[in-house]
Amino acid sequence: MEEDSLYLGGEWQFNHFSKLTSSRPDAAFAEIQRTSLPEKSPLSCETRVDLCDDLAPVARQLAPREKLPLSNRRPAAVGAGLQNMGNTCYVNASLQCLTYTPPLANYMLSREHSQTCHRHKGCMLCTMQAHITRALHNPGHVIQPSQALAAGFHRGKQEDAHEFLMFTVDAMKKACLPGHKQVDHHSKDTTLIHQIFGGYWRSQIKCLHCHGISDTFDPYLDIALDIQAAQSVQQALEQLVKPEELNGENAYHCGVCLQRAPASKMLTLLTSAKVLILVLKRFSDVTGNKIAKNVQYPECLDMQPYMSQPNTGPLVYVLYAVLVHAGWSCHNGHYFSYVKAQEGQWYKMDDAEVTASSITSVLSQQAYVLFYIQKSEWERHSESVSRGREPRALGAEDTDRRATQGELKRDHPCLQAPELDEHLVERATQESTLDHWKFLQEQNKTKPEFNVRKVEGTLPPDVLVIHQSKYKCGMKNHHPEQQSSLLKLSSTTPTHQESMNTGTLASLRGRARRSKGKNKHSKRALLVCQ
């Protein structure tokens, strides 16, 4: 018997025994025997060899790959700007990045989900479908994001854009599931959202005493990068996959030879996502201070050096969106984004203001979140333009339609938010609130093998964590609730307080001027309690 397998709560673990040193025949498998196994292991000897090709060979496919839209449905030109409803720049910046994610946008525009969804009310996929459709089909205008998009998250003050982004992605992933309790962990990783944003980590530990190897695989939806000692994204990725020696006090407790022995540990990507979300760790978890350094990131990124099998040819990704935070700390500042439209032109999406930009400007930002897509995926989802279909540009007609000089044309049908059933917001809030999401994040905390981001109190000092929420406890103590707990869709002129954080109207020529001091009146402290 050469190897055995474990499936532990959404995590695949394999132990390879190239050399058995114990005289007891059952000693090598003591680690396995100490763990309660399911009645039937989801991986058999036949399916293990296909692990790299398909991590879920026997799990129920909730969203088969062939159901992903193969044809492009996105308009070639840039879409609408988003009205800031008061401290919602973090919502707008995140939504724009998701709106211009090609496979997600094409799926939403196909309306495939809403035609079969039996929930409708409280379904984040249905809500995002409505938003993306409105945003992409109304170029030159300003639209109000639906109140349901931030129900349960927005508290009337600025929040972290990355946390809202992952909150939304997680809510969409849950909307793909037919029943939360009836689906096993591994089947959840076959959803449409995981097919787009998800991949698998591989953590391999090799005992230097008996040469036993332990492989553990864990899913991810984003990758956090420590930038304190890195000058570029490539350097941060190299640090992430750098081999680590476990010895002395950090010696590995081997499940094969049952001894504490020196070992080598390596973290690599077993599978890489179609869409790669790279989060640059710019904020201190304790003080909230920002690492305001320039970190270089390329327009094209080769991820092959960081894969478990690095010698299989280039794996090229192209940049299509950048989420930026302007300010000196997480307590204040402003969020905006850059997106690449299907026509290939870059645009700065600053709340309601939409202006054309250049790749030079895009690459010179102090980025917070980077969005990359596999080059082959970008080309496939942009095939209609490459075949010669003339991209639609914003011309005089659009200029006449858009609001100008800071006056919001609220009677324009594009600006009127759809009527929301009061039960929709209530149910969405009940099903997915910020506190509940953070509680689930803590419950499903990444296993120590993948803690590659920060020091854990119960782990050796050189073990790091991939991603951990900045909000863990003391939320109410440090962030008292404000009077407005949800987005308010108002049909009147914004108040002075709202206008301080409200972008100007959509303008591809950038004629409108943004108000100064955005979000500086809404401070918040980020504190992690171990």
Curated annotation (Swiss-Prot):
Residues 382-392, 398-412 have a biased composition (Basic and acidic residues). It is found in: Nucleus; Endoplasmic reticulum. GO terms for molecular function: cysteine-type deubiquitinase activity. SUPFAM superfamilies: Cysteine proteinases. It holds the Pfam family UCH. Residues 496-505 have a biased composition (Polar residues). Residues 510-524 have a biased composition (Basic residues). One of its GO terms (cellular component) is nucleus. Keywords: Endoplasmic reticulum, Hydrolase, Nucleus, Protease, Thiol protease, Ubl conjugation pathway. Residues 484-495 have a biased composition (Low complexity). It catalyses: Thiol-dependent hydrolysis of ester, thioester, amide, peptide and isopeptide bonds formed by the C-terminal Gly of ubiquitin (a 76-residue protein attached to proteins as an intracellular targeting signal). One of its GO terms (biological process) is regulation of protein stability. Its EC number is 3.4.19.12. Residues 80-375 form the USP domain. Deubiquitinating enzyme that removes conjugated ubiquitin from specific proteins to regulate different cellular processes that may include cell proliferation, progression through the cell cycle, apoptosis, cell migration, and the cellular response to viral infection. Belongs to the peptidase C19 family. USP17 subfamily. This is Ubiquitin carboxyl-terminal hydrolase 17-like protein 12. The gene is USP17L12.
